[in-house]
């Protein structure tokens, strides 16, 4: 019998091994849907972004009016812009669920896959940050000024580094031009890194909710999980379309409807909601360099996860004490997100400092010690 083309063709057999005949644990839940949802988000962002880039002008005197032109004069431009802006929010919702799933079910024990995933998170955050600057509204300008200024905290090279990134002595035309360049190229770098992420994942296969070896119980990815993922796509794209059409500015900042003005500072400078937890950690330390290091460590702490895993059990499914503290971490991150959007005054300063301390305490101290405690209690 002649071999099936999808199994013999050099290109098709890669696709076949990744999306069709891929052996997948039969018991993976909807939490395993977010990886493919992130792929859909990336494709949607690149597609909408490409059309927006055709009409956008990366110049300080024209950027704001070019975005207004897209929304007013370009056919369905308002929809493209709203899908792109809200698509970023959905991207981060999916990425945070995806990381949460990885932490809960011990997916970080696939070290290479996990580490590339954390690098991907940094890349997505960088892309979102430079993208937020492009409409050249008040929050775009002042957000760029505040965040890039943090690099001046780096000893010795700091001030030169900031001027090098700005391309001058302040956030200006050259900054906007290079930020647009970065915003255009980074999604393609993310796409390439995602392929490496998948390559390493397929070396080991997916984990499953129990954290046990699933070689005894695997099914082909298609049709079982391709259709299950398709349901997730419909739900997410439906929610994105609803948000983008009925409440497109719900997650945005009203200050960004005012053109950038270097002479007027907005009353509260804050990033988009998905960066607020890290922003709260940054603000909770009164020292500039300390704040910047805490900001970096709030994400880099994820690199430690494979090292500080001390439990003999992989998943939190069978670890009731650790499970409690996992949900405490989620609640704590939600509190940090809320604090990041509040003004810098009491009691918000104190709450932010306590929540920031707890964030690192749970990661660095409680996760490894609870693993050892549970091993002792289970006598393993």
Curated annotation (Swiss-Prot):
Q: Which residues bind heme b b566?
A: 98, 197
Q: Name one GO biological process term.
A: mitochondrial electron transport, ubiquinol to cytochrome c
Binding annotation for heme b b562: 84, 183
Highest taxon of source: Eukaryota
A molecular function annotated in GO for this UniProt entry is: ubiquinol-cytochrome-c reductase activity
Q: Which cofactor does it need?
A: heme b
One GO cellular component term: mitochondrial inner membrane
Mainly resides where?
mitochondrion
This protein's record includes keyword NAD: no
Q: How does it sit in the membrane?
A: Multi-pass membrane protein
Q: Which residues cross the membrane?
A: 34-54, 78-99, 114-134, 179-199, 227-247, 289-309, 321-341, 348-368
Q: What InterPro entries does the annotation carry?
A: Cyt_b/b6_C, Cyt_b/b6_C_sf, Cyt_b/b6_N, Cytb/b6-like_sf, Cytochrome_b, Cytochrome_b_C_euk/bac, Cytochrome_b_N_euk/bac, Di-haem_cyt_TM
Q: How is the cofactor bound?
A: Binds 2 heme b groups non-covalently.
Pfam families membership? Cytochrom_B_C, Cytochrome_B
Q: What does this protein do?
A: Component of the ubiquinol-cytochrome c reductase complex (complex III or cytochrome b-c1 complex) that is part of the mitochondrial respiratory chain. The b-c1 complex mediates electron transfer from ubiquinol to cytochrome c. Contributes to the generation of a proton gradient across the mitochondrial membrane that is then used for ATP synthesis.
The UniProt record's further free-text remark is: Heme 1 (or BL or b562) is low-potential and absorbs at about 562 nm, and heme 2 (or BH or b566) is high-potential and absorbs at about 566 nm.
Q: How does it assemble?
A: The cytochrome bc1 complex contains 3 respiratory subunits (MT-CYB, CYC1 and UQCRFS1), 2 core proteins (UQCRC1 and UQCRC2) and probably 6 low-molecular weight proteins.
Q: Which family does it belong to?
A: Belongs to the cytochrome b family.
Q: What name does this protein carry?
A: Cytochrome b
The organism encoding this protein is Pelophylax nigromaculatus
